[in-house]
From Swiss-Prot:
GO terms for molecular function: ATP binding; nicotinate-nucleotide adenylyltransferase activity. It comes from Borreliella afzelii (strain PKo). Belongs to the NadD family. PANTHER family: NICOTINATE-NUCLEOTIDE ADENYLYLTRANSFERASE-RELATED (PTHR39321), PHOSPHOPANTETHEINE ADENYLYLTRANSFERASE (PTHR39321:SF3). NCBIfam families: cyt_tran_rel, nicotinate (nicotinamide) nucleotide adenylyltransferase, PRK00071.1-3. Catalyzes the reversible adenylation of nicotinate mononucleotide (NaMN) to nicotinic acid adenine dinucleotide (NaAD). This is Probable nicotinate-nucleotide adenylyltransferase. It catalyses: nicotinate beta-D-ribonucleotide + ATP + H(+) = deamido-NAD(+) + diphosphate. The keyword NAD applies.
Amino acid sequence: MRIAILGGTYNPVHIGHIFLAKEIEYLLNIDKIIFIPTCNPTHKLIGEGVSVKNRIDMLKLALKNENKMFIDDCDIINGGITYTIDTISCVKKKYKNDKLFLVIGDDLFQNFDSWKDPQSIASSVDLVVAHRIYKERLKSSFKHIYIDNKIIPISSSEIRNRIANGFPVSYLLPFGVLKYIKDNNLYVKKVNV
């Protein structure tokens, strides 16, 4: 089986994440896509007011009608700081005989050599680089596959900022995720009294 791994904070998951997963499924003939929400990523802050449960609930809602997309909570279970090499080790234990593809955006790939044990990552999975902010392909000494995906210019941080400032986001999120955010009052500015 050909399995793609997409790690991220998913704070919140948005249509860009789902669109990229569909592109990967098509372009690489993927059988299964695993979304792995990070517990405490090394390269960004999660932010206040949004729990791990909230992020997983939103992912479940976003993926509920996708028969090839699943959630793996190995980083959540392990807790603490999340390193990609540890995530891959966890996934490889579950999928010993499958071909694994780790998908990262070019924004992260540009600093891939500074990650914990990048050579082991690149040698233990097929490293797939997706366009996120750069139209040109970045060069690297690490073995990788570049996919020519379409860039959807949205980010979770932009969505959080739009919600906090009262701007519409309905076209950026799966409906169930939007409803969950509204029902749970997530990402709104807290007013001090």
